[in-house]
Amino acid sequence: MLNNEYKNSSLKIFSLKGNEPLAQEVADRVGIELGKCSVKRFSDGEIQINIEESIRGCDVFIIQPTSNPVNLHLMELLIMIDACKRASAANINIVVPYYGYARQDRKARSREPITAKLVANLIETAGANRMIALDLHAPQIQGFFDIPIDHLMGVPIIGQHFENDPNIDPEECVVVSPDHGGVTRARKLADILKTPIAIIDKRRPKPNVAEVMNIVGEIEGRTAIIIDDIIDTAGTITLAAQALKDKGAKDVYACCTHPVLSGPAKERIENSAIKELIVTNSILLDDTRKPSNTKELSVAGLLAQAIIRVYERESVSVLFD
């Protein structure tokens, strides 16, 4: 717990159904109880939300990742924003540890939507005043909004884990980006651990299928740490791990901020060359989706600090790195 000074303040934190354990941990660290609200479903599937305490004039923070089931969690968020607006909240801040539809951030082919922008429009129209996000798949999504966005990074949390792991010697490690787009993220982790980086050149013939083509960098005899923002079906990460092993890597660790882990991901990871998978709790993982070799790190402390700084009208930029 960070402090007790916010117990009787106008700071309110609410959780929807997306990741209640994370929201509870954030509230505990801030030093307040979660706000009281009910989220129910009608028999036809419609969502009904009721805020069970006064929030008039309050600074409200709604914690909700729009993870699987994406559409249900997104609708819960939009309805809650509307409920807060109609209940006269002074400020409606949404805390989105995982932003669904972020991978649809551009037109890859003709006649395709830009759904990440559509979601931004929906959030703004519903009435949100600010968003605190964690590792957006495409940083330019911040530009889809006309409200302030605080974009936090999970890399420092992952870096701290490896720094404190007695089985890891940074001098014998190499940080690996699974594609060209992740080089900036890999460089940040490499800077923390003071290690070199490598890049995997891959081509994706069709969605959810990845082919590892070439590795750029020195791998032989080193412990390889693959870092990505999202692991979905785990095709990319497991093929990358095998390619690194084939190139002489001593051990292969994989890490990501957002463990989507859909479809065959669990089986693929458990049967792969990956020694350990390090993820954050930005997405709620049940045992049916969590590989046995998974280590989960908490982002609650980071989110709690961001919430307090926003509430106190202090700079959040110190949390960006």
From Swiss-Prot:
Cofactor list: Mg(2+)
Chain residues that bind ATP: 44-46, 103-104
Organism per entry: Staphylococcus haemolyticus (strain JCSC1435)
Localization of this protein: Cytoplasm
Gene name of the record: prs
Active site: 202
Organism phylogeny: Bacteria, Bacillati, Bacillota, Bacilli, Bacillales
A GO MF label: kinase activity
Residues given in the record as D-ribose 5-phosphate binding sites: 204, 228, 232-236
Name under which the protein is recorded: Ribose-phosphate pyrophosphokinase
Quaternary assembly: Homohexamer.
